[in-house]
């Protein structure tokens, strides 16, 4: 799943590869997918985009948005975005395929679930999109200790677990159940630990881990569990994920555990991250 580090990396790669290209053709909903949702109206994507010039791509939380003059192209969650050079074969299955006048292309294929869209400026009335654009990125200067303290001190979050605090309700756009695992590992906190049990030092450590962990992931091109615009895994070696379950903790050697929790999985070292 795309989360903030991957969104930042893919946006940068898009700017390096398709910025300035003119759209020649658009195919939407070529391959049906039950868990693909579309922003805007897919039958109108062609009329909306053909002839327009690709502008800058930006990451907003876990979303990647590409400008195309006064139109926008949006991807999120499990959208597998790939660039295809002039001589490269195009995928047979996809939910969106955009070809450019120079015969290069970009395709989007939904993995588990995800969103794709195209719409004119100001047209999309989607709360997740709006919040992702309005709230400060956790890697921006505006996301400081004062702002984080505002989030973690709210009365309504005191009985929540740290997983629920960080990865639900769009409190911090871009943090999902993936990057959450290493953030909590580096902070030495269990994902089920309650917010109201945190000391002031715990809160400082958690804030620091949010910043440093996400920064490491972003600067290394995303996590090694996710693929970039060219189908390559990110350079950040994920500590806690499906690939490290039942392997020794890199700090203490305790076997990493996996549990079902809150509709997904959590990974932790029971010695380093005591509840």
Task: Label each PLM-derived region with a short phrase.
Residues 1-130, 275:
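Acidic, proline/glycine-enriched N-terminal capping motif
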Residues 1-5, 104-109, 122, 134-141, ...:
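Short, mixed-charge, low-aromatic patches
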Residues 2, 78, 127, 145, ...:
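Generic signal for short, ordered secondary-structure residues
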Residues 3-6, 10, 19, 144, ...:
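Alpha-helical structural motif
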Residues 24-44, 53-58, 151-275:
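Basic, nucleic-acid-binding surfaces and adjacent catalytic neighborhoods in DNA/RNA-processing proteins
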Residues 49, 131-134, 139, 189, ...:
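Short clusters of hydrophobic/aromatic residues that line enzyme substrate/ligand-binding pockets
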Residues 87, 130-141, 193-200:
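Short histidine-centered catalytic/ligand-binding loop motif
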Residues 116-157:
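A short, charged helix-loop
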């Amino acid at each position: 799943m795309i989360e903030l580090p991957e969104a930042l990396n893919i946006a940068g790669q898009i700017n390096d590869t398709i910025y300035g290209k003119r759209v020649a053709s658009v195919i939407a909903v070529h391959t049906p997918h039950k868990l693909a949702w579309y922003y805007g109206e897919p039958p109108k994507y062609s009329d909306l985009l053909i002839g327009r010039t690709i502008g800058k791509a930006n990451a907003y939380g876990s979303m990647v948005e590409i400008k195309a003059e006064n139109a926008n192209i949006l991807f999120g969650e499990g959208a597998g975005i790939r660039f295809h050079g002039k001589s490269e074969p195009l995928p047979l299955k996809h939910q969106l395929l955009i070809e450019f006048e120079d015969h290069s292309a970009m395709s989007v294929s939904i993995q588990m679930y995800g969103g794709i869209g195209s719409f004119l400026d100001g047209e999309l009335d989607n709360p997740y999109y709006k919040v992702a654009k309005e709230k400060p990125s956790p890697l921006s200067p505006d996301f400081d200790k004062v702002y984080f303290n505002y989030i973690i001190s709210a009365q309504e979050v005191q009985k929540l677990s740290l997983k629920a605090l960080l990865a639900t309700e769009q409190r911090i756009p871009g943090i999902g159940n993936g990057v959450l695992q290493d953030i909590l590992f580096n902070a030495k906190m269990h994902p089920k630990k309650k917010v109201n049990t945190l000391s002031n030092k715990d809160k400082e450590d958690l804030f620091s881990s949010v910043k440093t962990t996400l920064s490491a992931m972003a600067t290394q091109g995303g996590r090694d569990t996710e693929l970039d615009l060219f189908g390559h895994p990110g350079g950040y070696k994920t500590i806690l994920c499906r690939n490290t379950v039942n392997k020794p903790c890199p700090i203490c050697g305790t076997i990493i555990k996996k549990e079902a929790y809150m509709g997904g999985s959590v990974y932790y070292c029971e010695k380093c991250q005591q509840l």
